[in-house]
Structure formats: structure tokens, C-alpha cells
UniProtKB/Swiss-Prot annotation:
Its main location: mitochondrion. This is Reactive oxygen species modulator 1. SMART domains: Romo1. Keywords: Antibiotic, Antimicrobial, Membrane, Mitochondrion, Mitochondrion inner membrane, Transmembrane, Transmembrane helix. GO terms for biological process: cellular response to reactive oxygen species; defense response to bacterium; positive regulation of reactive oxygen species metabolic process; replicative senescence. It is found in: Mitochondrion inner membrane. Has antibacterial activity against a variety of bacteria including S.aureus, P.aeruginosa and M.tuberculosis. Acts by inducing bacterial membrane breakage. The chain crosses the membrane at residues 23-43.
Length: 79
């Protein structure tokens, strides 16, 4: 598929670049949401210290990966 050229001679990002950008944006949003929800749920369970950091970090990575994957799929569909 030929690459479209913008009005000033700039080429548009490739489909892979769009999927990659979708994943990165989704991962960032998922990490932020995971930090909020993970902190709340870990504090509710009474975690403190190293256990709290581990629980929040795990929740951040899980929600970041999940939301990033869905955003990447959505951007791939739009290509």
C-alpha cells in the first residue's frame, strides 16, 4: 500500500507506527488508572510498605498492558 503524502511533503505514519502509538497511549492511561485503583484496593486490604508497592505495581502493569493491547487493536482496525 503506498504511503500517503501530506500537504507539505510529509509522509503519514505507517500502520505499525500507529499501532505502536496506540499501545503506548493505552499503556500510559492504563498505568495511571492502575495506580489509582491499585492504591485504593491495596489500602483497603490493609497492605503496607513493600507489600503495598508490589501490589500497586502489579495492578499498574496489568491494567496498562490490558488497556494498551485494546488500544493497539483499535488502532490496527483503523489502518
Amino acid at each position: 500500500m503506498p504511503v500517503a503524502v501530506g500537504p507539505y511533503g510529509q509522509s503519514q505514519p505507517s500502520c505499525f507506527d500507529r499501532v505502536k502509538m496506540g499501545f503506548m497511549m493505552g499503556f500510559a492511561v492504563g498505568m495511571a488508572a492502575g495506580a489509582l485503583f491499585g492504591t485504593f484496593s491495596c489500602l483497603r486490604f490493609g497492605m503496607r510498605g513493600r507489600e503495598l508497592m508490589g501490589g500497586v505495581g502489579k495492578t499498574m502493569m496489568q491494567s496498562g498492558g490490558t488497556f494498551g493491547t485494546f488500544m493497539a487493536i483499535g488502532m490496527g482496525i483503523r489502518c
